[in-house]
């Protein structure tokens, strides 16, 4: 035997030391089954893929020099011969016994002993089988193909494997096709895409398995999943016990995770609650500090720590007899100090009654007042001067809120033309420049002018107007000029704006440019010649008393329900629309508004100026909203009245806001608080046709309201009217 390496050839009658050259007859993927002549010795396949050399050493199959990978060993003179190609996808795990071999196996000795055929296994389970796809296995390295390249013959391999194989042998390892040039390799993009998808599916399965159980139990859970797909008749007791064990383990795991999650949520809740309470505690401590500071300041201002001198008290009557004085003295000293102490017993009765009524209102609206106080005082705490001004601001708010206790009627008028008239809605009430006369207009197409002093002085409720004017259509709004005492403007349902002489009843101007119903008209307080009107044609028109046509027009894009000039500027105008917004314009630039106030949920029926910087708006969403002309958000919302479909009137005297309600009542608000201050219920006056109707069944509503604003600023008188035509002159007391 020479020193050259052999792939492990041998025959049945040849000793292990004899030399026989091995050859490869074909590169097919299966063993050839064609018979060979009897004289031909059995041949053993050697590895040809990639030029892999056999293991070093000499000897046959059983010797120490056998090759690393042996495809098959066949012995016997009549056995089938063949070779195993390098493209074989799987190697048999046991040598197959050849048929027709007799008496030759003894020559191989113990080294050629046959291995038993192993039972197919799948994940360690007996009697199971898994069909693994070899579509993407490289015929050279028997692993998943990496960077698939193919030869001209169409076979695909890993690029590294086929490149190394062709460097040693220029033939295809699969079909033995001659590859002339190593560069004649082409990427197989389709196979690469399929392999990528296969890897993604495998990763998804592994991800689910890794996250469903721990790494130690992953194999057992894989067994459990396989058992679930097994027929129940094939399950034995061991399998059932395994499944129960895994389920109990999973149950305990889920219970532990659920309990941990509950504890985590509880911990988060407790921490958030603790943080909120700490913040509340800090806020309360700040508020207490402010309260203590203000209490000391008020005590110093009221002089409670200084003794009350005799000169500072109300002069007393002559002292009674000693017997009586002793009783009085003992009574006085037994009373606690404060509002009900001795110093208060010396006050006038009106003081005590006023204080009692204010206390009553303070108790009824304590929460609102408390909120108002802290919003005023906690807004910005700085120096002593700022603190004093904030306290004075709240003191003024508290004083105005508790000033009035009730609403008292002074006089009653009627706008109805006759007893059988079913509709006598008063749509507008306005005072003239000096508040000496007031005009009433409505759906009866009449404007009635009354003298305020005469109405108040008459002992009876039958009052006749000083003048009466008749229009061609229902009247929606009227407005007095702030400069000309007799000049009155009206708007009606035909879209006409008319200028009247309020005392003679003569028409001076008629404007007919609106295409639809005109809802509102208003004179400019700073420019006596300028007035504005708003209509359902989505236009606000500006008029001059000297001209016959409009001087400007603003496109509102929605029905205009109300229009009002600023009381402190000749250029600024506000109007409410059916688009739920209040639009604020500068007349020097009518192309776009200065501000659009959004917040109402329905159409804005009224917009009135509380001051030069504040606007109050009413809507059919049953809310009033207070706005600042320089801020887009709502300052305060007023709720309590009912307004869902009608024009119920809106007016303000600077501090108090009055509006009607669809429950036939008048509501009053203070601009600093959101809740209702006072209410006044109109009596239901039944006509002859409605005498059998119950009071709760009526659909009457307060339709108009107006304050009597005097030049000195005192304004506690207002006039309100309802849909029955009843007009009430009311006073706040």
UniProtKB/Swiss-Prot annotation:
Q: Where are the zinc fingers (RING-type)?
A: 138-176
Regarding domains, what does the record say?
A: The RING finger domain, in addition to its role in ubiquitination, functions as a structural scaffold to bring two clusters of positive-charged residues within spatial proximity to mimic a bipartite nuclear localization signal (NLS).
Per UniProt, the short sequence motif Nuclear localization signal 1 occupies residue numbers 111-115
- The protein's superkingdom reads Eukaryota
* Main location class: nucleus
Q: What is the lineage of its organism?
A: Eukaryota, Metazoa, Chordata, Craniata, Vertebrata
UniProt cross-references to CDD domains, sorted A to Z: RING-HC_COP1 (cd16504), WD40 (cd00200)
**What pathway is it annotated to?**
Protein modification; protein ubiquitination
Protein name per the record? E3 ubiquitin-protein ligase COP1
Q: What GO CC terms are in its UniProt record?
A: Cul4A-RING E3 ubiquitin ligase complex; Golgi membrane; nuclear speck
Coiled-coil spans in chain? 231-306
Q: Where in the cell is it found?
A: Nucleus speckle; Cytoplasm
Q: Which InterPro entries does this chain map to?
A: COP1 (IPR042755), WD40/YVTN_repeat-like_dom_sf (IPR015943), WD40_repeat_CS (IPR019775), WD40_repeat_dom_sf (IPR036322), WD40_rpt (IPR001680), Znf_RING (IPR001841), Znf_RING/FYVE/PHD (IPR013083), Znf_RING_CS (IPR017907)
Q: Where is this motif: Nuclear export signal?
A: 237-247
